[in-house]
Swiss-Prot record:
Residues 1-28 are annotated as: Disordered. It comes from Mus musculus (Mouse). This is Embryonic testis differentiation protein. Specifically expressed in testis. The gene is Etd.
């Protein structure tokens, strides 16, 4: 057997096995006016003045 130049067997690249936690939203602001109105009706007020002024102008 000839062992002068053993051929290197390429290894497959290692996969990243670290689990990355999903990013969580830092604020609980409503995504749209419908969510804002439903939350307001259910007694979960938000401190979003722009939406409050928009709702106030509809009255």
């Amino acid at each position: 057997m000839d062992e002068k130049n053993p051929e290197a067997v390429p290894r497959p690249p290692e996969q990243n096995t670290e689990l990355v936690p999903p990013k969580k939203s830092k604020s609980k602001k409503p995504a749209n006016i419908l969510i804002y109105l439903i939350d307001r009706h259910l007694g979960r007020p938000r401190n979003d003045m722009d939406l409050f002024e928009w709702v106030w102008t509809l009255k």
